[in-house]
């Protein structure tokens, strides 16, 4: 039996110690102790635990953010890493080494696993593997109920059995590929929340003949701020049909918008926000900070803002906030899956910015291989070397699938992409 076969079959003796790259603070210098990994005892699993061997780990730009922010990262909740270290590495391929007594009907030694790291606890709080739960930059570690029986129901298992002969490195790419696929699935709420809180902000002299074709029947609380008479009439008419709490807060300055958070449950923000005829980028930026987790932000108007907005892009990723809009007059036209398409348009043109990076290449590959995908795929990057690799890899794939692949470097082009 060769060394690779021995590795796969677990016939080699289990070491007494394992090397671990623990993260004890922000900065690359705090990965390990003195720039070196640490030796730790290989633990014995309890009844509800697995001892796993980490076979491959992929590193992600999310790890770079974690290194920069340390305990201030949103998924570490101000954790003092000097006292409670964590480990990077959420893209992992694992092999089960030992199985606790209570798990032997579900798992077995030499079983291969991959892991879905976006884990939640009983309170619905993110406890992601490689963040809150120490990750895969270690040779051997325990996996217990925090992964195998987690989620709000305390029954969700976040490991997935891996069948077949997929390579270790390829298996570790399951998580980033899942992220790519998830980008084309609708995970955001696209209608006004039933029983939620709605804030509508406008200006009284707005002459637009607004209508609300659907959704106004959903909120339990509606806060009105300087809305035009037509919109107030719609809300008052709804209140005559059913119980709904209506609160007015008019004459608000941009600086005072933050005070509206007190009108939401637990100060968590509004489930839905509608801004009518927005003009001020500063105002829209301040209003957007009041969106609750999984909330919607609907801009209805035809006039460009007076500048660029400051939007917390991280909340789009971590809190699933949705930014919607239309030109009016139907406020409800912004909502729904039909308007908010999440898949690439069949026969269309898709532009991928930063396409030369690892995730960018995966998005380009998916677009080229998608049977009902775009006809033209534009890959842009400012790194000529990355673009050269991308073209060499994917030009044959584009030809194979009858797609047009356009490579564009804005720093080297004489004309803009639009030209």
Predicted feature descriptions by range:
Residues 41-58, 72-119, 135:
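Glycine-rich beta-strand-centered segment in the early N-terminal region that forms part
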Residues 78-81, 90, 117-195, 326:
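NAD(P)H dinucleotide-binding glycine-rich loop of Rossmann-like/cofactor-binding domains
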Residues 106-109, 291, 344:
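Short, well-ordered loop/turn sites that connect or cap secondary structure elements
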Residues 145-147, 171-218, 330-350, 356, ...:
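Short internal alpha-helix immediately C-terminal to a glycine-rich phosphate-binding loop
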Residues 195-206, 211-283, 333-334, 340, ...:
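Adenosine-nucleotide cofactor-binding segment
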Residues 281-289, 300-321:
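Rossmann-fold NAD(P)-binding glycine/threonine-rich loop
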Residues 295, 348, 375:
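Glycine-centered, small-residue-biased loops immediately flanking beta-strands
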